[in-house]
Amino acid sequence: MTILIKNNNLQQLLSSWIKLSYSYTISGIQSDSRLVKPGYLFCVLKKKNINETNKHMIHAIKNGAKIILYDTKQKFKNGTLKKIINHVPIIYFFKLSKNLPQILKKYYHFENNFTLIGITGTNGKSTTTHIVSQWANLLNVKIGIMGTLGHGINNNLKKTDNTTESSANIHQFLYHMLKQNIKTFAIEISSHGIVQHRIEQLPFKIAILTNITPEHLDYHRTMDNYINAKKAFFFKYNINTLIINADDLIAKTWIKKLNHKNVITITTKDQNFNSISPKKWIHANKIIQKQNCTNIHFNSSWGHGILNSTLIGHFNVINILLALATLLELNYPITDLVKVCKYIKTISGRMEHIHIVNKPKVIIDYAHNTNGLKNLLSTLKEIFNKKKIWCIFGCGGDRDKTKRPYMGSIAEKMSDQVILTNDNPRNEHPLKIIKNILSGCKFKNKIRIIPNREHAIKFAVNNADKEDIIVVAGKGHEKYQIINNKYYHFSDHKIIKKLLNKKNYDFN
């Protein structure tokens, strides 16, 4: 077992920023009040709502926080006492959000003897992360993963709140995994995580880019801001090995500007491969897609081979090639990787098939943005080209509203039947969201509105022919529905299995 020693002396830990008169030994650091334990340093990263901030402080104190650092933008307050609650001092800390990663780095002081992989992009982060993990596991190597589907090893994952967790949670995860002698980690990197400093001070060895298309414009405001957030991970972080999908138009423009780094490109297009001329590369020169598998013929700077995979869709070809490049760069033998590729399983809620004899095939997918839905439906039209496609989807409330009409347009053009339903409406009225989606649709005769998601799925299952394809998009692996900001248990997977197994299904 790896021996790790934390820097628990608080005065010493914070000496670069503030001088404390409090001589404390801490047992941990957290920015989430729910995860605070006795003896912890709690870091209050200020929220817009001051009542929420105070509520988190009280919660942290009840959980045993020993001392609290309180974020401030006023430099003159740095290191001064804000107040004391129940014998717990609350100290102002200038730009705590920005400095917290550095404090955590000093607290854990990891030796640089492990491999940390960061995977970013609009779509495909979870799938690529899990392919890397599964593939390595098939060759008897365990990889710690952290992202949308959870954190841990292989199928033994614990729930995460965000695609990219807080800086405190990431460091804590690495610490516990290193104690178990895990030496390689793959972490999903969101644009929010980059902008909010959550991944700063982490010793990334490899950065992977899946693709860049419009997303999170409610947060970033413009596409340029979103692109620049992703770009920062490759240009501003000290990461030497960069693995890039050269089929992506935006990513392709970055490659020559990064020629001072160890850039590895993957591509499925001959013209892209010929125009880039990279030092390290993988080029899929022939792709055969079937209804239940994909064959990928590839050449590379490591050698050539044929990958057989049960994952379908061109976007999954990209994800597989990115994972392949990662493992080849980490010196996994190409022959072994080719041999075991066929055993990689479908990732939960990502192009996941549920099929029972004499019933329509149902596909669950997390596609929740314009490009994701387009790729999903175009793949199904190509592979199941003579079958009728039903598309059930909605758009999240209190999120990017600009994508709604585009998603409506894509669904009606690429599906035979469309059912608009709820997908985490949050604080928005469900019918208002559906109206926004409908504004992009021209042929409303093929569209049905059933806000209750369970009812929508039931309607499709009961009315689709056994040869039809039903696509349930947007929620994927999620096991909840958010309505009026309350979480209700809901699983597409569970509902579909129940419906397909029962002829006469009654709603609860």
Curated annotation (Swiss-Prot):
Instruction: Please state the protein's primary subcellular location.
Output: cytoplasm
Chain residues that bind UDP-N-acetyl-alpha-D-muramoyl-L-alanyl-D-glutamate: 33, 162-164, 190, 196, 198
Q: Name one GO biological process term.
A: regulation of cell shape
What are the GO cellular component annotations? cytoplasm
Q: Which reaction does it catalyse?
A: UDP-N-acetyl-alpha-D-muramoyl-L-alanyl-D-glutamate + meso-2,6-diaminopimelate + ATP = UDP-N-acetyl-alpha-D-muramoyl-L-alanyl-gamma-D-glutamyl-meso-2,6-diaminopimelate + ADP + phosphate + H(+)
Q: How is this chain modified after translation? A: Carboxylation is probably crucial for Mg(2+) binding and, consequently, for the gamma-phosphate positioning of ATP.
Q: Name one Pfam family in it.
A: Mur_ligase_C
Write the record's keywords in alphabetical order, separated by commas. ATP-binding, Cell cycle, Cell division, Cell shape, Cell wall biogenesis/degradation, Cytoplasm, Ligase, Magnesium, Nucleotide-binding, Peptidoglycan synthesis
State the superkingdom.
Answer: Bacteria
Q: In which pathway does it act?
A: Cell wall biogenesis; peptidoglycan biosynthesis
| Sequence positions that bind meso-2,6-diaminopimelate | 399, 423-426, 474, 478
- Annotated localization: Cytoplasm
Q: Which family does it belong to?
A: Belongs to the MurCDEF family. MurE subfamily.
Q: Which HAMAP family match?
A: MurE
State what this protein does.
Catalyzes the addition of meso-diaminopimelic acid to the nucleotide precursor UDP-N-acetylmuramoyl-L-alanyl-D-glutamate (UMAG) in the biosynthesis of bacterial cell-wall peptidoglycan.
What protein am I looking at? UDP-N-acetylmuramoyl-L-alanyl-D-glutamate--2,6-diaminopimelate ligase
The species this protein belongs to is: Buchnera aphidicola subsp. Baizongia pistaciae (strain Bp)
Lineage, broadest ranks: Bacteria, Pseudomonadati, Pseudomonadota, Gammaproteobacteria, Enterobacterales
